[in-house]
Amino acid sequence: MTRDLLARRERQALCDLALVLGEDAPTLSGDWTAKDLVTHLLLREHSLVGAPGLLIRPLSRLTDLEMARIGKKDFTVLVERLRGHGFTPYAIPAVDRAVNTLEYFVHHEDLRRAQPGWTSRDLDRADESALWSAIRVFGRGLVRPAGVPVRIRRTDTGAEATLRRGADPAVLTGMPQEIVMFLYGRNQHRGLGFTGPDKHIEALRTAGLGLSPSRHELLLRPHPAVVSCHDFG
């Protein structure tokens, strides 16, 4: 039996966990709560009014207003709305895989890893490889703030990828899921190793990787979805 895409399974798992933890649960996305996170994801996928502000700074005020409007809805209603793609480009498997694999994995982990006693998940090889394929692409933009050559290496297979070219790179080694969390600027990760020139390692570790919670979609999202924000009522 063919499994759903990792992006779709992570979407469902995020929704399940959000309901268990409740709307006020903390996340690793700045000071966002679980409800803020769910509201943001709905805006990203469904709002013609608010989504452009995630990309275009002068429109960010509209994004804030739309976040506030959507956030007035009942948390359970919002979570169940997020479970489905609706009539958006994200319902297309190729788009979902390209845009949402990291999106929903990172945000699911934002909920998981903000809780006391979290542990890394035992993902199978196929899921780790899906994360690896995605971070090889999006990681190039994520490491720009470091300003140094960067390579990543999987501990399970030994595969390597260059994220920023140059001599004497900082080499980040670990499981793909942990590499993803580090490159998205999350401070909750396990089992990572760093090799290379000390100054390059220091630059990578202190660069403030990832994007701020209000802007972290810039590298992930396609053109705004074609469903009107009025679907939220």
Task: Locate predicted features.
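An N-terminal domain-cap segment
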Residues: 1-53
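Short, charged, amphipathic alpha-helices and their helix-cap/turn boundaries
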Residues: 7-16, 71-83
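Context-gated lysine
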Residues: 35, 72-73, 199
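Acidic catalytic motifs of isoprenoid enzymes
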Residues: 66-70
